[in-house]
Amino acid sequence: VVTNDGSSGLAKTSVLVTGGGSGIGLGVATALAAEGVHVTICGRNEEKLARAAQQITTDNPAGTVDTVTADVTNEDDVIRAVATASERTGQLDGVVTCAGGNETVGPVTQLDVDAWRRTVDLNVTGTMLTIKHSARALVAAGGGSIVTISSIASSNTHRWFGAYGPSKAGVDNLTQLAADELGASNVRVNCIRPGLTRTDLVALITDGGPVLDDYMANTPIARVGEVTDIAALAKFLLGPDSTWITGQIINVDGGQMLRRGPDFTSMFEPMFGADGLRGAVAP
C-alpha cells in the first residue's frame, strides 16, 4: 500500500525500536520517523538515546520520538518500554528488536562462560522478553507486527565469534515459534538477518583490510550493507503490504549466505596465536 503522498501507510502508528540509540536500531527508527511513525527508542545509555532522538527529529522535523532507558534483559524495564511506546496513540502497532551484541571472542576452547551467558541473555532472553510483552499489547490491539533482528552469523559460521552465532540462531527459532503461536491473534513475527552492515560497531572491518576483502569475495553483490538496507525491509514487514507474511527469516546480505562466513584469521591470530585458533591450549 502506497498512499497518495508516496508514504508506506505507517503514518500515525506506534512502534518500539529496542537498541534504537545507535547502529541498525537508529537507522530503523530514523526511517520510521520519516514515515510519520510515533517511534519509541530504548537502550541502556540515556545520553546516547537523547543524542539519537535529537538526530532523528532534526532529520525528520515532523517525526515524534520518545526515549526509554531500558535493559531488555530486565523484565520490568521491558514492560515499561512497551507501556511508553503505547502512550501516544493508546496502542502499540509494531516492534523491532535491534538490541543485541557480543561479549565473546576467541576459540571455543578459551571462551569465558560468564561472557557467554551475558551474550545469550542479551540476544535471546532480551528478544524473548520484548516479544513476550509487546505481543500482549499487540494482541490487545487486534494485531500488529514484530520484526526481530538476527545475523548472517546464525546460519554461516563466523569462527571465533563465540556465543554470537548460536545466540542469533536462537533468535531465528524464537521468531518462528512466536509466529506460529501468535498468528491466530493477527500478530505477525518475522526476522531480518543482516550481513556485514556499516555501523560504528564494525568500523574496524568496513574501513578496509583482509577481513573486508574476504567478505567481498564471498558476497555476490559485493558491497557493504547500509542501515538503510535493513530499515527498508523493516518498514515493509511492519506495514500493510506484508499482512500475509509471518514466520520468515529474510537475509539482507548481498547473497553472502550462498557462500561461506568470513575469514577472521588476520584479526584473531595476533590475539590467540595460530595454535590457539585451532583449539590448542597451553598446559
Residue ranges and their predicted role:
Residues 191, 210-245, 252-254, 279-283:
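C-terminal helical subdomain
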Residues 151:
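Residue(s) in the substrate-gating loop at a strand-loop-helix junction
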Residues 21-23:
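Conserved glycine-rich cofactor-binding loop
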Residues 4, 105, 235, 246-283:
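Short C-terminal tail/terminal secondary-structure segment
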Residues 106-108, 115-117, 215:
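Substrate-binding pocket helix/loop in short-chain dehydrogenase/reductase
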Residues 136, 180-184, 243:
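Alpha-helical segment proximal to the catalytic Tyr-Lys
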